[in-house]
């Protein structure tokens, strides 16, 4: 996994969300968008805290970035899966692709278990 590319993708989504809220006339909410992965730290199950411009509800955004195509596989942590389950109505996965060329994105809303085929690829071993 390329951490630098991931951080660039997160920054892209922070700017995108602020811009979306400004266009909706919600300067107040745009100022509240928080890059939690940087400001608070990893481990919350999402990277960006944003808001719905209509009802002001929180949007918990996990960002997955690739320089490759739309369907290139991505990795998620158990914490991200749990967050998507526990906070399904607020959880959004932004899949940023073609980053470095013309970045584009699609959004999956709700449970990752319901939106994706999840395949275990890492196991913890104890003796």
Which residues fall in each region the model found?
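Acidic-basic catalytic patches of nuclease active cores, encompassing PD-(D/E)XK
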Residues: 1-32
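Catalytic cores of nucleic-acid endonucleases
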Residues: 4, 56, 63-111
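Extended, charge-rich C-terminal regions with high alpha-helical propensity
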Residues: 44-46, 56-61, 124-127
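Conserved catalytic cores of phosphodiester-cleaving nucleases, focusing on short active-site segments
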Residues: 13, 17, 48-50, 59-67
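A short acidic/basic microdomain associated with nuclease active sites
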Residues: 20-51
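Protein C-terminal end segments and domain termini
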Residues: 103-127
